[in-house]
Amino acid sequence: MTDLTTHDLAQPGWQTRDHLDDPVVGELCNRFGPDAFTVQATRTGIPVVWVKREQLLDVVAFLKKQPKPYVMLFDLHGMDERLRTHREGLPAADYSVFYHIISIERNRDIMLKVALAESDLHVPTVTKLFPNANWYERETWEMFGITFNGHPHLTRIMMPHTWEGHPLRKDYPARATEFDPFVLTKQKEDLEMESLTFKPEEWGMKRGTENEDFMFLNLGPNHPSSHGAFRIILQLDGEEIVDCVPDVGYHHRGAEKMGERQSWHSYIPYTDRIEYLGGCVNEMPYVLAVEKLAGIEVPDRVKTIRVMLSELFRINSHLLYISTYIQDVGAMTPVFFAFTDRQKIYDLVEAITGFRMHPAWFRIGGVAHDLPRGWERLLREFLDWMPSRLDTYVKAALQNTILKGRTQGVAAYNAKEALDWGVTGAGLRATGIGFDVRKWRPYSGYENFDFEVPVGDGISDCYSRVMLKVEELRQSLRILDQCLKNMPEGPFKADHPLTTPPPKERTLQHIDTLINHFLQVSWGPVMPANESFQMVEATKGINSYYLTSDGGTMSYRTRIRTPSYAHLQQIPSVIRGCLVSDLIVYLGSIDFVMSDVDR
């Protein structure tokens, strides 16, 4: 599973390290020479290596060909470096592009960075090495104006095609009040309507062959089977899908831009809405990444409470996924079962946090308040109720021969294809790779829990993905039972000046302790200048936050990597040659919501 040593796992997450002892750094230096790189010390927990633009493709190709290769492009994006003041020892750069690549066999990551001058914002595309770089490069061009030479279709992806400017540049306004008043003239309205006219050539499609014309069909953005504001343009020969193009961005809210104008604390409610079904699961990577920046170790009680809430929301999300998946195939009853079961979870979550879907309850250094009296009874009642209900879902619907006939062998892909497209979560594990962050890279005390990671037999299809989620539900119930029986005693927040007001008795003795409290409450906590990273096993795959602090009260750069974005990009490669009815089943089996895609 991993070649991480006990020493690696024992290192504090908040320790600033250059990771020169990581084998991959030595391999790169032996191949390209030590002068080819600048190694950056961060709190990301992985090697961060600046490479020269002209060597980028060679370095990436080298990493892919190693005995234990780096096979998944996990993330790719950019940063406007122009206003960053703490850049000691780094290459001169107005902008930078980073490439986060994972080796499954090593269970290790590396982040490559390329420095760019404002006068020459060009970098070669890596789409020939990693096909999933396509969407990431399009978004980076759109947000920063960085051109990827050789990209097959470098167009806007999140914003309308008529949009002007690059929103994540530091000189781009962050609030509507900073723009000129919006006026929709007749000319502008006509221009906007004209831009919506469908032209196959603009999407890389052919109108037809020498002997026949293709039919083009819009599925969405208001179709019940598209699971949100999501459009897929289908190129059809009869009912067979010749090609298709996913069209995303309708739900884009500028979540990463918002991170640059909210304090470290006040951004927490926004994290709930990245994947609006995941609740506290979405808060976890953000608060852990901020705690790395601050150097905060939280009490064991906090870790266990966070795990408990995360698993409750995981079950809640999985139940909705399984029931709507069955509904997409044609059965209604499980949906009503699921909402009954999910109501019990919401009652429990509301009793603990005070809210239901979006509690914004995790805090930097702890949680908002301690567990209420009676939480054990509510959790025990749910744990007694749920296992038999799961059996009902399986017997009533998932073992149905019609459902199996509609889903087995449909939209199937293997492990290599999953890694090429950046697939994580159940979609990857169904191919036989048991990569679950809770097991492979434990966080928040998951290493103390006894649970299994369900793994498929080598092929991920619509049926295997949903059955894996059923088994994951059983494992989450197992984790919750351990939380109930082994909840540690102790405080529900860390005693740290960046996050927690001092006790009153201390302020009565030392008035200077109020200085920190005054600053944190009025301006927000000031985080040390550094970079941190945290990935978690979210409800739909791996979710991560990559934070850059410039020593201020707000994040200099907040990068959010979501699993659904990668999963939707994979759709054309899987569904070509299938029928439209197969696409409906495939969409239901992915488990996505558009807020997770569009951010």
Swiss-Prot record:
It is an enzyme of class 7 (translocase). Its main location: membrane. PROSITE patterns: COMPLEX1_49K. Pfam families: Complex1_30kDa, Complex1_49kDa. Its EC number is 7.1.1.-. Residues 1-189 are annotated as: NADH dehydrogenase I subunit C. It comes from the Bacteria. GO terms for cellular component: NADH dehydrogenase complex; plasma membrane. NDH-1 shuttles electrons from NADH, via FMN and iron-sulfur (Fe-S) centers, to quinones in the respiratory chain. The immediate electron acceptor for the enzyme in this species is believed to be ubiquinone. Couples the redox reaction to proton translocation (for every two electrons transferred, four hydrogen ions are translocated across the cytoplasmic membrane), and thus conserves the redox energy in a proton gradient. NDH-1 is composed of 13 different subunits. Subunits NuoB, CD, E, F, and G constitute the peripheral sector of the complex. This is NADH-quinone oxidoreductase subunit C/D. The gene is nuoC.
